[in-house]
Amino acid sequence: MSEWLRFLKRDQQLDVYFFAVPRLSLDIMGYWPGKTGDTWPWRSLIHFAILAIGVATELHAGMCFLDRQQITLALETLCPAGTSAVTLLKMFLMLRFRQDLSIMWNRLRGLLFDPNWERPEQRDIRLKHSAMAARINFWPLSAGFFTCTTYNLKPILIAMILYLQNRYEDFVWFTPFNMTMPKVLLNYPFFPLTYIFIAYTGYVTIFMFGGCDGFYFEFCAHLSALFEVLQAEIESMFRPYTDHLELSPVQLYILEQKMRSVIIRHNAIIDLTRFFRDRYTIITLAHFVSAAMVIGFSMVNLLTLGNNGLGAMLYVAYTVAALSQLLVYCYGGTLVAESSTGLCRAMFSCPWQLFKPKQRRLVQLLILRSQRPVSMAVPFFSPSLATFAAILQTSGSIIALVKSFQ
């Protein structure tokens, strides 16, 4: 276990932090794209089938509760069902774009570990972003794991409390998540196996969104690192000529070639960002919609079960997990946007006036292109910390408004 969680320690090698959480989560589920992405492990299809059964039975149970006008039970059922349904969509798209994800990961790794860009400050930038991404990614995974474990332990804890209070007449076993199951599976001797199966569907959801969302944030963090590495490269290019008033033809030629190399790499990073954003468009859009629904359902659950300590704890855990997932997407988008515009400021602060008019066009080209931030926006949503703050503000306002009517 300690070997798996080495990325939480300080002073580890870069390869320990690099895609640590997504690799761990997706590899367990069989969805890590690997070097080529042209093979589908059997466990990926098995986990897809398990979650598909869980989603279908959970949605059916939620609709049945709605039909009987049991609103509280319906919300308790549909809240995890919505998360699982979106996770099932993520699983399908991860398989659909498995080869593309592998290509993107290899291209990112090739750009990030280019031997021509191995200055100490550039290595520090890569290490800082990798360590930060690993630790932030671990937060939504651990929050989701706690939420799922709370759901799975709830029936056992209630049974223990009833047993200790000698309330045997009220003793009834029920499953962690409300699912429509054949009666034969809810009776002895099959009930323990049914309980384990239903509990496991929750962990499939947790590890899949931890891996899929973690892959998104890790990719954004390393795209940000690439932009910052370019900034460091530009500053190091001009550093020897800070005190010069004029450059020789040889110096101009060398600097021009380096400048062209920076522009080529800048274009490659932007192309990679767009390619990645296109593959994650549906996932990002579905995630924002589902997170909004989960937060809404959870708020209603809190307001209706406010006096129930265990119900309130489930609400808090679910809301923290949903907000953690949103934070991963929003912070990732902010990192990419801010670091891409930082390249413009770094270029402008250098003594670019040493160039001749012909070479200055390269500088103007880079400044013009980097003035517009590289966006991870999808239809209707733009992942950024401003969006995350607006969601928090809206959620708080709705809670305060509903509380005032009680």
UniProtKB/Swiss-Prot annotation:
UniProt keyword ATP-binding, yes or no: no
Bilayer topology term: Multi-pass membrane protein
Listed GO CC annotations: dendrite membrane; plasma membrane
Stretches of the chain found on the membrane's Cytoplasmic side: 1-45, 96-143, 211-281, 330-372
Residues annotated as transmembrane: 46-66, 75-95, 144-164, 190-210, 282-302, 309-329, 373-393
Ranges of the Extracellular topological domain: 67-74, 165-189, 303-308, 394-406
Tissue specificity statement from the Swiss-Prot or TrEMBL entry: Expressed in olfactory sensory neurons in the antenna.
GO MF annotations, alphabetized: ionotropic olfactory receptor activity; ligand-gated calcium channel activity; ligand-gated monoatomic cation channel activity; odorant binding; olfactory receptor activity
InterPro entries the record matches: 7tm6_olfct_rcpt (IPR004117)
Compartmental location: Cell membrane
GO biological process, one term: monoatomic cation transmembrane transport
Glycan-linked positions: 178
Subunit structure: Interacts with Orco. Complexes exist early in the endomembrane system in olfactory sensory neurons (OSNs), coupling these complexes to the conserved ciliary trafficking pathway.
Family, per entry: Belongs to the insect chemoreceptor superfamily. Heteromeric odorant receptor channel (TC 1.A.69) family. Or1a subfamily.
Anything else known: The atypical heteromeric and topological design of the odorant receptors appears to be an insect-specific solution for odor recognition, making the OR/Orco complex an attractive target for the development of highly selective insect repellents to disrupt olfactory-mediated host-seeking behaviors of insect disease vectors. Odor-evoked OR currents are independent of known G-protein-coupled second messenger pathways.
Protein name per Swiss-Prot or TrEMBL: Odorant receptor 10a
Species, as recorded: Drosophila melanogaster (Fruit fly)
Gene name of the record: Or10a
